[in-house]
Amino acid sequence: MRTFLSHTLLLFAVLSLAGCKKDDSPAQQTIADIVNSDSRFTLLRAAVAKANLGSALSTGSLTVFAPTDDAFRAAGLDAAAVNAAPVATVTSILQNHVLGAKTLSGDLPTADNTEVTTLGGGKIYVTKKAGAVSVNGARVTQADVTASNGVIHVVDRVILPPAGNAVQVASANPNLSLLVAAVNRAASGNPAVLTALTGPGPLTVFAPTNAAFNAAGFADVAAINAAAPATLANILLYHVVPARVFSTNLVNGDVTTAQTGKVTVAVSGSGVTVKGAKNTTAANVTAADIVATNAVIHVVNQVLLP
């Protein structure tokens, strides 16, 4: 009898210890707890503290697309930049990563660009195909990190909220000033160009850099303004696709543009290229998935020639 009691007490002790260990599992931690303890999220942690959102990430039922430190740095957001940014800006960025309900990767529809409303009221676009998930072109590198108040999906990019329509976003980038000048010059003869680029969309814009315009014979704004508006309109519409296509949605093949001609897209492990009908070589996409309210912008290093 004494042996039986000893074994029974030992069993209860083991079960009690097992129960204590279970309470410390990730599923018993809040989203805020996981962010605070995971070494990949030191910059996310700093942003959460800056925006004072720790309590918000400890309650409710949420989904958080969590950028790693590498993702923050790739967006130019190191610790100094996060701490120097206005609270409203950091809050807006963070809210663009949060959904107001727990959504596991298995619950996401297998589709391109499913529109989802974030906690901040903005829109993000989730793509799921062959089991891989991306959000606005940011890839989910680890899905379904469960917490007591929701789930975390780790992403490889910061999902920035749009800063305006396609023209407004381009206008804020000094490296795209000749593109903006070309849009304005084309609009003087064909208002439909500006209307399309500032309208509701959705669009994809392959945006040539200033260096790309220089190489195509447009040395400066004066050269742009000396060109025929109809010529510029024809070229610009050849850079616009009447659909929202993130880099993760691009596939090898021809794509029909708003000019009605086709460009040829090639996707490889080294990146994405786009070739116009009269280009001798393909343009490289040098910056992808810049989100505007009406478009996604991919910066290219050549002007595409129809």
Residue ranges of each PLM-predicted region?
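Mature, structured domains of secreted/extracytosolic soluble proteins
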Residues: 2-8, 20-306
